[in-house]
Amino acid sequence: MIQNGINKDFINKDKSHNQKITKLTVMCMVYKEDGSFLVENRLKKDWPGLTFPGGHVEDEELIIDAVPREMKEETGLEVSNLEPRGYIEWNEFGDDVRHLAMLFKTKSFKGNLKSSKEGEIFFIKEEEIKKYPLSNDFLEIYKKLK
Protein backbone atom coordinates (compact mmCIF):
# COMPACT_ATOMS: atom_id res chain seq x y z
CA MET A 1 0.00 0.00 0.00
CA ILE A 2 1.44 3.37 -0.99
CA GLN A 3 0.40 6.37 1.08
CA ASN A 4 1.89 9.87 0.81
CA GLY A 5 4.49 8.44 -1.58
CA ILE A 6 5.66 5.84 0.97
CA ASN A 7 5.22 2.13 0.49
CA LYS A 8 3.90 1.14 3.94
CA ASP A 9 4.61 -2.55 3.32
CA PHE A 10 8.30 -1.73 2.84
CA ILE A 11 8.75 0.19 6.09
CA ASN A 12 10.48 -1.91 8.77
CA LYS A 13 10.29 -5.03 6.58
CA ASP A 14 14.06 -5.52 6.87
CA LYS A 15 14.49 -6.59 10.51
CA SER A 16 18.25 -7.14 10.11
CA HIS A 17 18.84 -3.57 11.26
CA ASN A 18 17.10 -4.06 14.63
CA GLN A 19 15.66 -0.58 14.47
CA LYS A 20 14.25 0.96 17.62
CA ILE A 21 10.79 2.37 17.93
CA THR A 22 11.00 6.15 17.44
CA LYS A 23 8.48 8.43 19.12
CA LEU A 24 8.23 11.82 17.43
CA THR A 25 7.33 14.80 19.60
CA VAL A 26 7.32 18.60 19.39
CA MET A 27 8.14 21.33 21.92
CA CYS A 28 7.62 25.06 21.59
CA MET A 29 8.95 28.10 23.42
CA VAL A 30 6.48 30.97 23.34
CA TYR A 31 8.24 34.17 24.35
CA LYS A 32 7.42 37.83 24.98
CA GLU A 33 9.42 40.96 24.21
CA ASP A 34 10.13 41.42 27.96
CA GLY A 35 12.25 38.24 27.89
CA SER A 36 9.74 35.98 29.62
CA PHE A 37 8.84 32.63 28.10
CA LEU A 38 6.16 30.00 28.58
CA VAL A 39 6.87 26.85 30.61
CA GLU A 40 4.92 24.00 32.09
CA ASN A 41 5.68 22.76 35.60
CA ARG A 42 4.82 19.13 34.90
CA LEU A 43 3.46 16.91 37.62
CA LYS A 44 3.50 13.62 35.71
CA LYS A 45 6.15 11.18 36.90
CA ASP A 46 7.43 10.39 33.41
CA TRP A 47 8.78 13.95 32.87
CA PRO A 48 8.44 16.04 36.09
CA GLY A 49 9.60 19.63 36.53
CA LEU A 50 9.85 22.66 34.26
CA THR A 51 9.61 21.90 30.58
CA PHE A 52 8.36 23.52 27.41
CA PRO A 53 4.82 22.68 26.27
CA GLY A 54 4.42 20.15 23.51
CA GLY A 55 3.51 16.56 22.85
CA HIS A 56 3.37 13.66 20.42
CA VAL A 57 2.95 13.95 16.67
CA GLU A 58 -0.10 11.91 15.67
CA ASP A 59 0.05 9.25 12.95
CA GLU A 60 -0.30 10.84 9.49
CA GLU A 61 0.11 14.35 11.04
CA LEU A 62 2.74 16.78 9.78
CA ILE A 63 5.20 18.01 12.40
CA ILE A 64 4.36 21.63 11.62
CA ASP A 65 0.65 20.87 12.23
CA ALA A 66 1.35 19.12 15.54
CA VAL A 67 2.85 22.23 17.15
CA PRO A 68 -0.27 24.46 17.03
CA ARG A 69 -2.51 21.52 17.97
CA GLU A 70 -0.41 20.57 21.00
CA MET A 71 0.01 24.19 22.10
CA LYS A 72 -3.75 24.76 21.97
CA GLU A 73 -4.40 21.52 23.89
CA GLU A 74 -1.76 22.10 26.56
CA THR A 75 -1.76 25.88 26.99
CA GLY A 76 -4.96 27.30 25.47
CA LEU A 77 -2.87 29.48 23.14
CA GLU A 78 -3.01 29.66 19.36
CA VAL A 79 0.52 29.97 17.98
CA SER A 80 1.79 30.96 14.53
CA ASN A 81 5.01 32.02 12.75
CA LEU A 82 6.90 29.04 14.14
CA GLU A 83 10.69 29.15 13.95
CA PRO A 84 12.44 25.74 13.83
CA ARG A 85 15.26 25.54 16.40
CA GLY A 86 16.62 22.03 15.98
CA TYR A 87 15.93 18.85 17.87
CA ILE A 88 16.92 16.72 20.84
CA GLU A 89 16.84 12.97 21.15
CA TRP A 90 17.08 10.47 23.99
CA ASN A 91 16.53 6.81 24.72
CA GLU A 92 13.92 5.35 27.05
CA PHE A 93 13.39 1.86 28.46
CA GLY A 94 17.04 0.99 28.07
CA ASP A 95 17.69 1.43 24.39
CA ASP A 96 14.36 0.08 23.10
CA VAL A 97 12.64 3.42 22.40
CA ARG A 98 14.19 6.53 20.89
CA HIS A 99 12.48 9.89 21.36
CA LEU A 100 13.02 12.65 18.82
CA ALA A 101 11.69 16.07 19.83
CA MET A 102 11.54 18.81 17.20
CA LEU A 103 11.99 22.26 18.79
CA PHE A 104 10.25 25.48 17.77
CA LYS A 105 9.89 28.99 19.13
CA THR A 106 7.52 31.86 18.45
CA LYS A 107 6.45 35.24 19.78
CA SER A 108 3.18 35.11 17.82
CA PHE A 109 0.36 33.89 20.02
CA LYS A 110 -3.17 34.73 21.12
CA GLY A 111 -5.67 33.35 23.59
CA ASN A 112 -5.87 32.79 27.32
CA LEU A 113 -3.50 30.55 29.25
CA LYS A 114 -4.96 27.40 30.76
CA SER A 115 -3.22 24.81 32.88
CA SER A 116 -4.11 21.13 32.73
CA LYS A 117 -3.86 18.00 34.84
CA GLU A 118 -0.33 17.60 33.44
CA GLY A 119 0.88 20.77 35.17
CA GLU A 120 0.74 24.53 35.63
CA ILE A 121 1.41 26.77 32.60
CA PHE A 122 3.00 30.19 33.18
CA PHE A 123 5.48 32.76 31.86
CA ILE A 124 8.86 32.93 33.57
CA LYS A 125 12.13 34.84 33.19
CA GLU A 126 15.54 33.19 32.94
CA GLU A 127 16.64 34.29 36.42
CA GLU A 128 13.60 32.53 37.95
CA ILE A 129 14.42 29.07 36.52
CA LYS A 130 16.53 28.08 39.53
CA LYS A 131 13.47 28.33 41.82
CA TYR A 132 11.90 25.26 40.21
CA PRO A 133 12.77 21.60 39.70
CA LEU A 134 13.81 21.04 36.09
CA SER A 135 12.81 18.21 33.77
CA ASN A 136 15.49 16.09 32.12
CA ASP A 137 17.54 18.10 29.63
CA PHE A 138 15.62 21.35 30.31
CA LEU A 139 18.76 23.50 30.25
CA GLU A 140 19.99 21.86 27.03
CA ILE A 141 16.60 22.48 25.40
CA TYR A 142 16.50 26.06 26.71
CA LYS A 143 19.91 26.82 25.16
CA LYS A 144 18.69 25.59 21.77
CA LEU A 145 15.52 27.68 22.01
CA LYS A 146 17.05 30.97 23.25
Predicted regions and their residues:
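A short coil-to-beta-strand element that immediately follows conserved catalytic motifs
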Residues: 78-86
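Short, acidic, Ser/Thr-enriched surface-loop or helix-capping motifs
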Residues: 31-32
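Residue-level preference for beta-strand/loop junctions
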Residues: 22, 80, 98-100
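Acidic, metal-coordinating catalytic segment for phosphate/diphosphate chemistry
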Residues: 1-27
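NUDIX/MutT-family hydrolases
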Residues: 103-105, 113-145
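Conserved Nudix-box catalytic region and its N-terminal flanking loop in Nudix hydrolases
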Residues: 36-73
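Active-site-adjacent beta-strand/loop module that shapes the phosphate/pyrophosphate-binding cleft
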Residues: 88-112, 145
